[in-house]
Design a protein with these regions (language model features):
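Basic helix-extension-helix modules of the SAP/HeH family
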Residues: 372-438
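N-terminal alpha-helical "arm" segments
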Residues: 1-49, 355-367, 436-438
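Assembly/oligomerization interface modules of large self-assembling protein complexes
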Residues: 34-111
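Extended, solvent-exposed, turn-rich assembly/linker loops in the middle of proteins
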Residues: 164-241
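Long, contiguous amphipathic alpha-helices that act as assembly "spine/axial" helices in icosahedral shell
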Residues: 85-174, 200-216, 336-345
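Sequence/fold signature of self-assembling virion shell proteins
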Residues: 227-397, 438
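Long, low-complexity, charged/polar intrinsically disordered regions
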Residues: 144, 176, 389-392
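Short linear loop/turn motifs
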Residues: 25-29, 38, 48, 269-274, ...
Length: 438
């Protein structure tokens, strides 16, 4: 590493990069939920385990980044010691771009008036500072993506720049007892919302916010109960045969809040990722999971001090942005490059997961009546759950043992709805006490 090729321009301004970033961000008004919903927590030993963050439920290990398996199912490569992962990005000026700035520099040096000189210098500074700004925002974007994934999934995979090909898998320990599927497969019902509210009430918690993907909210607005909810709010008279139009987002969210005393927070955030020179836009929030919260603050943004911050490399210019982002500028040769490097030790940590409730709307989450097998069961003796056949009387008995009211002569539809209304923990208990019938 050598000093920047344009040291005469950046030596005075680079330490003030933090001010430039904030000034440039203001008009854009980028929104970052991780900055609103996480409290910054400093870790003196560069570990997230020993901080004031509540990590009672958190478990972490190292896994392969490129495995096709879902994050939760990837095999463990090593045990994590709680070290904060290094997150960062680089912006590089190559020879063509360096030559372009050199031409600006020549114009600056040959300018005949102070005004012209000032204008040329500003052009050069803008070009050089933009990369620092991009690195700072890039780290924010990664933090936002990590946060949205963590909050919706309960599990996060963060690539560590110091360990190529592996990533830190953090499982925040979302409770199976607080995770539910939809009662009717593929549809979110009024009863699904009430089901989760009842569980929270039983736990002594009060749900205040529902975070949901825009696409999922659009699906919900089309449901009959959603249309009726808004029609009732508008004091409309209707019957079961009345066609009710799909309500607007604003009307439905207001009616929903009036009905359940829960505010809807719509998530529709995209983040651009770059790999092997290819950019791809991705929405990190899992649209199939609706997350119910009891607090606006859901955890900590744990950060540490980079070794390079206390052991600076000679010739490299450094700037600190938002306390934890270290932005450096330097040049290299063979080939000639001007590099801006942004790095940080940071991890969003979801806390108080006993106050987080999830409605998993994915197709594989809820079961449905197996109509083909039901036709063959002329005596109505069995109920099929997730492809396995059980004695219906046994299923009903176990549902009653879990406190679920089901009639002795309940139809398969009613039994399946009762099974779908269970939390993950209850469903596991139910199936463990049943014996599949050949």
């Amino acid at each position: 590493m050598k000093e920047s090729l344009f040291i005469q321009f950046i030596s005075a301004i680079w330490p003030k990069l933090n001010l430039y970033v904030k000034e440039k961000e203001a008009p854009v008004k980028r929104s970052y939920l991780h900055k609103e919903m996480l409290l910054p927590v400093y870790s003196s030993d560069q570990k997230w385990e020993g901080t004031s963050a509540k990590t009672t439920y958190v478990a972490a290990d190292m896994v392969a980044m490129d495995s096709p398996l879902p994050i939760k199912k990837r095999g463990t490569l090593a045990t994590s010691n709680g070290k904060l992962p290094k997150v960062g990005m680089k912006k590089v000026l190559r020879e063509t771009e360096i030559n372009a700035i050199n031409i600006m520099k020549a114009h600056y040096e040959t300018a005949t008036t102070d005004e012209a000189k000032k204008a040329e210098k500003q052009r050069i500074l803008t070009k050089l500072l933009n990369d620092g700004d991009a690195c700072s925002i890039g780290i924010d974007e990664k933090n936002e993506a990590n946060f949205l994934t963590a909050l919706s999934e309960g599990v996060l995979l963060v690539e560590d720049e110091d360990n190529a090909g592996t990533g830190l898998r953090v499982n925040f320990g979302y409770l199976d007892s607080n995770t539910f599927g939809t009662i009717v497969k593929g549809h979110v019902s009024y009863e699904d919302i009430e089901n989760i509210r009842s569980k929270a009430d039983a736990d002594g918690n009060t749900i205040t916010t529902l975070m949901v993907a825009k696409s999922k909210l659009n699906d919900i607005r089309k449901e009959r109960w959603a249309r009726e909810l808004v029609a009732d709010a508008d004091d409309k008279v209707y019957t079961d045969e009345t066609t009710l139009k799909v309500p607007s987002v604003s009307k439905f969210t207001q009616a929903f809040q009036d009905e359940f005393d829960i505010e809807i927070k719509v998530v529709d955030r995209s983040v651009i990722f770059e790999k092997n020179g290819q950019q791809k836009s991705k929405k990190p929030w899992n649209a199939e999971r609706m997350v119910f919260l009891c607090s606006d603050t859901v955890g900590s943004l744990v950060w540490g001090t980079l070794a390079e911050a206390t052991n600076p490399v000679e010739g490299v210019k450094y700037a600190t942005v938002d306390q934890y982002k270290l932005i450096s500028k330097y040049s290299t040769t063979d080939p000639l490059r001007e590099t801006t490097n942004g790095q940080s030790l940071v991890l969003p940590v979801i806390e108080d997961v006993d106050q987080i409730y999830v409605l998993d709307c994915s197709e594989e989450k809820s079961t449905e009546v197996d109509k083909e097998k039901e036709k063959l069961d002329t005596a109505d003796t069995f109920t099929t759950i997730n492809g396995k056949k059980y004695k219906k009387a046994d299923v009903i008995a176990q549902l009653k043992a879990l406190g679920v009211k089901v009639a002795k002569n309940a139809t398969d539809e009613n039994v399946i709805s009762a099974v779908n209304s269970l939390s993950d923990e209850q469903e596991t208990s139910l199936l463990s006490n049943l014996t599949a019938q050949g």
